[in-house]
Amino acid sequence: MGKTSQRKQCDCENPSKPCLSTSIPLRMSSYTFKRPVTKITSHLGNEVRYYQWEETLEKPEQACWQKRLQGLQAYSSAGELLSTSDLAKTLKDLTSTDTVASASDTQATSIDITSVPTLESSSHLANMIPEAGPQILCKEFLVTEQDIINQERKVKIARERLAVALIAHKLASEMETVRGSRKANL
């Protein structure tokens, strides 16, 4: 009985903790941020509570470079607006005419045309678009059914080799544990 009365006295002496409240929890980072930082997520049908000053907070900018480039437009050296289809067509025309013209040179040395970059087209492109600089343009690579079958075969062989290696590793580790337990028993 004496112990319980002592406990009651200790409970009465301890005031309630100030951190226990019904307000929205805030993460305070005084070193980095000037204001308390919270993440507000609203879901369909849910009511999200937030402070009035949080309504005016700016959302962070998109860090993904593709999203930032979506609104940009390409211009020619004359200042005309280029559409993406015109640019793609021009590049395709440049690469196809230059590779056909240089095909006789590459066939004499028996080098595959698709693997050789066209330097003439890059200089021609640099004349059309000075900001592009010297670039190496390559022909587009066509994937055939045979390429897919060969790749699937290589993947299957690699998986089989990996399975064999994992089984060998498992057996070796089991042998080590058995040897270790035998040495401990001796």
From Swiss-Prot:
Its main location: nucleus. Highly expressed in testis. Not detected in the other tissues tested. Disulfide bonds: none annotated. GO terms for biological process: negative regulation of transcription by RNA polymerase II. It is found in: Nucleus. InterPro entries: MBD2/MBD3_p55-bd (IPR032343), MeCpG-bd_2/3_C_dom (IPR025884). Keywords: Nucleus, Repressor, Transcription, Transcription regulation. The keyword Electron transport does not apply. Does not bind methylated DNA. Belongs to the MBD3L family. This is Methyl-CpG-binding domain protein 3-like 1. It comes from Mus musculus.
